[in-house]
């Protein structure tokens, strides 16, 4: 039973009672005392008190509640409706369309605690299981791991209608104070909207949090919702962006605000409502989207519509179930809203009128240590890094917590560190319980936490907030603003090479911000630690956290909070875990496909570009090199502070002055790139390799400051070898040097022999040539010296060469200059693609007469000869 939130991943299995302890007999020595109890006196438990709000039931309060066992453990609940009959949910006994054998099930009656039987408790075998012929399905077309059913193994791609089952016992139950039948409503019985009813069971107390020992029967008060009100709530997207259409015979109970509900393991149990001094079985626990989630009430099978079906199948049983007449028809109260005028409950957490001033910020002070910052996650619990406290004496009398707008400091009752806190950076978390509950208002208030299936959408507005020990932000407030990177960029840029990128709905390994403002020069963030807050529909979630950075740059990757929801929920039993609020996936829908991250080099990721990205949108290493005199050249970012360009475009022949050069990244012509920001840098030096008697074809431009790696400014990988093998290659450039929108042209690299034959006497060492695919020769203009890029399947992009002056087919290779680049740059990303040498044998005698020097002959003739004489390097 739950008054919080739940995800159905654990089936409650309890088997403390030894096998054979009952053997269809009564435990109590006074077993015959109540054999003549009047079965017509249904729905009248022994007088007792009960605790409101989802808690332990008093023994004997709900004497019709039974526990269904299979394989020695509890699987579902049920209700005794006659000495030989139990009513439960059909889905408890159907797996893949097949009904479970009745002889594998048993019914435990008169039990209050699963840890030990009461007097009068006894077990009965099941003789027969009956389900309606119209036990049907409603296809949702989505992953239904969220649905609360009896067992995850029994989940299917649908929600069941007519979800009820009759179980005939092998021998009648022994009636007594703890074993009595419940009344059944007639088909004409009406339960008023807003009626306070009660659900009972031994299910999970929260999502994925089983009922703890001694497994005492739980009860929770729920209010009935009318069909219009319930459908209104379920018509709004919720977990996994699912909506749901109620079927006839379904009944809803709960609250728009959630936090009280049934949970997994309660399936088949009773929802009873009092009417005229009797308790009627109004519904059977069927399913739900999580447990106790906001605007997601529990769904029950209404019993009244099945009066005829029940009577038909129990006919001849004496005594049978009782269907008392309803003394007075109720009228729905004002609580029932109209569907077109439905009001949704809003989150009770994550409200910050002034971002940057966080009403949940908690400052924990321990004698002898600097303050540690965390976040208030409920009215009694603070979440903070465990590393703040692992070496501190646990003398909680001296610990204090300062909360916003609280004149006095709070005292600490206990500390619960994550079990992996000392071994795993991603589990560096601890929960501090306050001695007294805090009245949550505008300040202090709690931050929202994400469920494990929460998918923070790419582009979500996020912000850094203080976390753990460390200094304040060294820069302006704008330095803390960020948008969230999509999963592919995050995991492939900052995660492990070759890892599979989690799909939306699966817990991510990392969360990564893309900062909106560039790093301020001279600042270092090494002494500060941060959490990542992300906003959805005006509500802030604690999305991730990171302790002290390992460098001066702002933190790039955060440990996600999604994976820790079950632990936080289990410890606090009151933290504000909130459903996803934003579902506008926009252009990032391609992330639903399985993707793997390319190889990294020793300096990290390079040459990353999503497969599905349009050619003119994102080439994060492509730079515009603006040279004095309105000349614009193509450049390639090869390290955070270096750009590679063609010498002939940067330096004019005969010029003795060094031009002023500006470099721009993060834009495609006049448009800025998504997932990042435009970057500009000035060039402070131009480096050329030493070439005896020849002007070197490549130049390195040193930038005045480093460029932060991002999807809009990322170094490319460099190929240090010869002609790459098994790679597809393209020339990347601009169709029009005025608008500078990137275009690519597919090419094949020719063998050294063919290249030598086509250009005899004019090839310099380290030069190679390409053949354009049909119709692509004129896609890129050549004055800006475009680069040649290659990529192997699933691999990163690699720079192979830069165009030679005035020629679209000839390129200066990167390989011969690899040593010079490595010595000059230091952080260049080299990735060898294999392949053959660039050098070819000298002498025209090795070239066919018709081919030698035929580079300017008609292309058709040249292409035919090339195809006949030598293979092309495959694209």
Swiss-Prot record:
One of its GO terms (biological process) is proteolysis. Residues 24-50 form a propeptide. It is found in: Secreted, Extracellular space, Extracellular matrix. PROSITE patterns: TRYPSIN_DOM, TRYPSIN_HIS, TRYPSIN_SER. The 3 protease domains are not proteolytically cleaved. Residues 51-315, 347-573, 608-826 form the Peptidase S1 domain. One of its GO terms (cellular component) is cytoplasm. Glycans are attached at residues 96, 134, 241, 341, 420, 439. It is an enzyme of class 3 (hydrolase). The active site is at 91 (charge relay system), 163 (charge relay system), 267 (charge relay system). It comes from the Eukaryota. Residues 320-340 are annotated as: Disordered. Its EC number is 3.4.21.-. Belongs to the peptidase S1 family. The first serine protease domain is catalytically active, whereas the second domain lacks the essential His residue of the catalytic triad at position 387, and the third domain lacks the essential Asp residue of the catalytic triad at position 697. The second and third domains are therefore predicted to be inactive. Serine protease. Hydrolyzes the peptides N-t-Boc-Gln-Ala-Arg-AMC and N-t-Boc-Gln-Gly-Arg-AMC and, to a lesser extent, N-t-Boc-Ala-Phe-Lys-AMC and N-t-Boc-Val-Leu-Lys-AMC. Has a preference for substrates with an Arg instead of a Lys residue in position P1. This is Polyserase-2. It comes from Rattus norvegicus.
């Amino acid at each position: 039973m739950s008054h919080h939130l739940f995800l159905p991943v654990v089936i409650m299995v309890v088997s403390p009672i030894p096998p054979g302890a009952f053997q269809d007999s009564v435990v109590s020595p006074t077993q015959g005392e109540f054999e003549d109890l009047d079965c017509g006196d249904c729905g009248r438990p022994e007088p007792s008190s009960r605790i409101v709000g989802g808690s332990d039931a008093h023994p004997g309060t709900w004497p019709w509640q039974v526990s269904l066992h299979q394989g020695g453990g509890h699987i579902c609940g049920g209700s005794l409706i006659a000495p030989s009959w139990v009513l439960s949910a059909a889905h408890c006994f159907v797996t893949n369309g097949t009904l479970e054998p009745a002889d594998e099930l048993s019914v435990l009656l008169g039990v209050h605690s699963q840890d030990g039987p009461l007097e009068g408790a006894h077990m009965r075998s099941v003789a027969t299981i009956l389900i309606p012929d119209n036990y049907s399905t409603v296809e949702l077309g989505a992953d239904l791991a969220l649905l609360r059913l009896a067992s995850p193994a029994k989940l299917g791609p649908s929600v069941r209608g007519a979800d009820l089952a009759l179980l005939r016992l092998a021998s009648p139950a022994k009636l007594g104070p703890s074993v009595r039948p419940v009344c059944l409503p007639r088909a004409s019985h009406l339960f008023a909207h807003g009626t306070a009813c009660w659900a009972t069971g031994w299910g999970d107390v929260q999502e994925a949090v089983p009922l703890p020992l001694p497994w005492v029967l739980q009860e929770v008060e729920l209010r009935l919702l009318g069909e219009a009100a319930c459908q209104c709530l379920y018509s709004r997207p919720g977990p996994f962006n699912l909506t749901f259409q109620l079927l006839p015979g379904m009944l809803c109970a709960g609250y728009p605000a959630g936090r009280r509900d049934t949970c997994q393991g309660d399936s088949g149990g009773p929802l009873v409502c009092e009417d005229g001094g009797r308790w009627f079985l109004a519904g059977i626990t069927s399913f739900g989207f999580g447990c106790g989630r906001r605007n997601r009430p529990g769904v029950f099978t209404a019993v009244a519509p099945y009066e005829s079906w029940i009577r038909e199948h129990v006919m001849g049983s004496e005594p049978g179930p009782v269907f008392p007449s309803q003394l007075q028809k109720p009228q729905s109260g004002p609580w029932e809203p109209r569907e077109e005028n439905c009001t949704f409950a809003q989150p009770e957490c994550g409200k910050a009128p002034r971002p940057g001033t966080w009403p949940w910020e908690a400052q924990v002070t321990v004698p002898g240590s600097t303050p540690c910052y965390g976040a208030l996650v409920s009215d009694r619990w603070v979440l903070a890094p465990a590393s703040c406290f692992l070496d501190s004496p646990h003398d909680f009398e001296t610990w204090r917590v300062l909360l916003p707008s609280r004149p006095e400091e709070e005292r600490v009752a206990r500390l619960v560190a994550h079990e992996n806190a000392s071994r795993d950076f991603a589990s560096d978390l601890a929960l501090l319980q306050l001695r007294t509950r805090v009245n949550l208002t505008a300040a202090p208030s709690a931050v929202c936490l994400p469920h494990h299936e929460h998918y923070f959408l790419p582009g979500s507005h996020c912000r850094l907030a203080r976390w753990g020990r460390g200094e304040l932000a060294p820069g302006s407030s704008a330095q803390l603003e960020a948008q969230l990177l999509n999963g592919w960029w995050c995991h492939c840029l900052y995660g492990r090479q070759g890892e599979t990128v989690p799909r939306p709905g699966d817990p991510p390994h990392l969360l990564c911000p893309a900062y909106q403002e560039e790093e301020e020069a001279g600042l270092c963030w090494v002494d500060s630690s941060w959490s990542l807050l992300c906003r959805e529909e005006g509500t802030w979630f604690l999305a991730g956290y990171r302790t002290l950075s390992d460098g001066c740059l702002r933190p790039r990757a955060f440990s996600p909070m999604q994976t820790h929801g079950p632990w936080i929920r289990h410890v606090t039993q009151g933290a504000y875990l909130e459903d996803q609020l934003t579902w506008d996936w926009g252009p990032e829908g391609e992330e639903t496909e399985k993707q793997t991250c390319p190889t990294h080099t020793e300096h990290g990721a390079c040459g990353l570009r999503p497969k599905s990205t349009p050619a003119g949108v994102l080439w994060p290493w492509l730079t515009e090199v603006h040279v004095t005199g309105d000349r614009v050249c193509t450049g390639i970012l090869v390290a955070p502070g270096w750009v590679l360009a063609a010498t002939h475009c940067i330096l004019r022949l005969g010029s003795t002055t060094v031009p002023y050069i500006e470099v721009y990244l993060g834009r495609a012509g006049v448009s800025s790139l998504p997932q990042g920001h435009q970057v500009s840098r000035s060039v402070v030096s131009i480096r050329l390799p030493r070439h005896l008697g020849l002007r070197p074809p490549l130049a390195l431009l040193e930038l005045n400051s480093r460029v932060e790696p991002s999807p809009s400014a990322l170094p490319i990988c460099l190929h240090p070898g010869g002609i790459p093998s098994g790679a597809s290659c393209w020339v990347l450039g601009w169709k029009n040097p005025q608008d500078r929108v990137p275009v690519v042209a597919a090419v094949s690299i020719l063998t050294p022999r063919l290249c030598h034959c086509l250009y005899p006497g004019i090839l310099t060492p380290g030069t190679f040539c390409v053949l354009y695919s049909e119709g692509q020769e004129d896609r890129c203009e050549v004055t800006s010296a475009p680069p040649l890029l290659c990529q192997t399947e699933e691999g990163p992009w690699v720079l192979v060469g830069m165009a030679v002056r005035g020629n679209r087919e000839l390129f200066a290779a990167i390989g011969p200059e690899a040593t010079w680049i490595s010595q000059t740059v230091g952080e260049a990303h080299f990735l060898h693609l294999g392949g053959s040498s660039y050098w070819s044998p000298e002498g025209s005698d090795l070239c066919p007469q018709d081919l030698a020097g035929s580079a300017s002959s008609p292309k058709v003739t040249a292409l035919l000869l090339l195809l006949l004489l030598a293979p092309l390097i495959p694209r």
